[in-house]
Amino acid sequence: VTGHKDPTPEEMEEALSKAKEDWVEARDRDEAIGIFLKAAAVAMDRGVFFVVKGPVVSVWTGFPEAVDEALKGVEIKLSEAPAIKGVIEGKNTYKGIGPASEGVFQDFYKGLGTAEAPKEVIICPVLINEQVISVFFGDNQPSGRSIKAQGYLGTLSRKLCMSLEVLILKKKIMEM
């Protein structure tokens, strides 16, 4: 549920609890990522999930649905995205002003439904075996709210990592 008000601690706890239950039952990575995005939507107006592919990140999915459809498959070179590159290299969350609305980001922001860079974004890494495999990019530009759920999104990101690691282990068990 994408909202235009800050979520209460109870709403975030309820979404996290539901996500944890769902991750235990997740059958594949798409389902695990969908669970993450649904829980992230409690605190964020928009979100995009990128997959790291060497020197580029590629949009995998996002919310709301219009963003997902507009951006699916869009690639951004890390050399043109210092904030995303910094998250990948440092394995830390970034919270701050959105990358400048020029070059590849101009098209990216149009896909998000805006012409200018968001005043504030959050970019969270998703790690498996200490390697960043993907990043979540979220903002509240439509409502103009500041991002106050950094801890919540970090917890979601860590739980997603665990869920993906369990899925990898299940696959290895079946292959042996």
Which residues are covered by each model-predicted region?
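Regulatory loop-to-helix N-cap segments in sensory/regulatory domains
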Residues: N140-G154, L167, K171-M176
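Short hydrophobic beta-strand micro-motif common in sensory/regulatory domains
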Residues: K119-L127
